[in-house]
C-alpha cells in the first residue's frame, strides 16, 4: 500500500502496461483533436481562396464600408463608456452630497481641508507681504 502512491509519482517505476495505456490515450486524444483542426484549416484555405477574388473586386466598396462601420462602432462604444462614467460620477456626487459617504469621500475631505489651509496660509503671507511693502514704502 505504501508503494502505490510512490508509483504514481515516479513514472519510471510504473508498470509498462500503465505507460502504454497513457501513451495510447494521449495519442487518441491528440489525434481526435488534430483531425478537426486540419479540417478547419483546409476549409479556411478553401474559403479564403474562393473569397479573395471577391475581396479584390469589391475592395473599393468594402474598405470604406469597414472603416465607416468601425468608426460608428467606436463612436457608440465611446459614447456608452462616457455615459456610464457620467452616471457613475453623478451617482457618487449625489451620495456625497446626501451624506451617504461614498468610497473616496475621506480622501476628498482631506484634500479639501489641506487646500483650504494652504489657501489661508497664502492669504496670510500675502497680507504680511502687503503690510511690509506698505510700511517699507512709507518709511522711504
UniProtKB/Swiss-Prot annotation:
Annotated GO biological process: lipid storage; post-embryonic development; reproductive structure development; sexual reproduction
Transmembrane segments: 31-51, 75-95
Membrane topology classification: Multi-pass membrane protein
Keyword terms: Allergen, Lipid droplet, Membrane, Transmembrane, Transmembrane helix
One of the record's GO cellular component terms: monolayer-surrounded lipid storage body
InterPro entries linked: Oleosin
Major subcellular location class: other
Compartments, as annotated in UniProt: Lipid droplet; Membrane
PROSITE patterns, alphabetized: OLEOSINS
Tissue specificity comment: Expressed in seeds.
Protein role: May have a structural role to stabilize the lipid body during desiccation of the seed by preventing coalescence of the oil. Probably interacts with both lipid and phospholipid moieties of lipid bodies. May also provide recognition signals for specific lipase anchorage in lipolysis during seedling growth.
Family that this chain belongs to: Belongs to the oleosin family.
UniProt name for this protein: Oleosin Cor a 13
Biological source species: Corylus avellana
Organism phylogeny: Eukaryota, Viridiplantae, Streptophyta, Embryophyta, Tracheophyta
